UniProtKB/Swiss-Prot annotation:
Specifically interacts with cognate toxin CdiA, which inhibits the toxin. CDD domains: CdiI_BpE479-like. Signal peptide: none annotated. Coiled coil: none annotated. This is Immunity protein CdiI. Immunity protein component of a toxin-immunity protein module, which functions as a cellular contact-dependent growth inhibition (CDI) system. CDI modules allow bacteria to communicate with and inhibit the growth of closely related neighboring bacteria in a contact-dependent fashion. Neutralizes the toxic activity of cognate toxin CdiA (C-terminal 160 residue CT fragment) upon expression in E.coli. Does not inhibit toxic activity of CdiA from other strains of B.pseudomallei.
Length: 109
């Protein structure tokens, strides 16, 4: 069973089950305590619905910006891991798709 990180209705990052588990774990560990509401919202389909996806669709620009910053912290922390090269491509895809989201006002950059 595979998973997905949904950015918007049209944009998602499809991942294998192992990639999904890896990303969700690493990203989840990097939320600041003041931003846990964002984690709760994004992780809701997985935590309460038992689904194999997380979604940023409902976040406004501020929430998405915080999520991107959290992803960047998680990616940086993961670089020290021996397994990082196995996941580097999927990290890059996720960061690129988040940065292109119109809610961040940097579409196309």
């Amino acid at each position: 069973m595979a998973g997905s990180i949904v950015i918007s209705k049209e944009v998602r990052v499809p991942v294998s089950t192992s990639q999904f588990d890896y990303l969700v774990s690493r990203i989840g560990d990097q939320f600041h305590s003041s931003d846990m509401w964002i984690k709760d919202e994004v992780y809701l389909p997985m935590e309460e619905g038992g689904m194999s996806f997380i979604s940023t669709e409902s976040l406004n620009s501020s929430g998405l910006s915080i999520f991107l910053a959290t992803v960047m912290r998680a990616r940086a922390a993961s670089q020290a891991e021996e397994s990082f090269p196995l996941y580097e491509n999927v990290w890059n895809q996720l960061v690129e798709k988040l940065r292109q989201d119109a809610r961040l006002g940097v579409s196309g950059n």
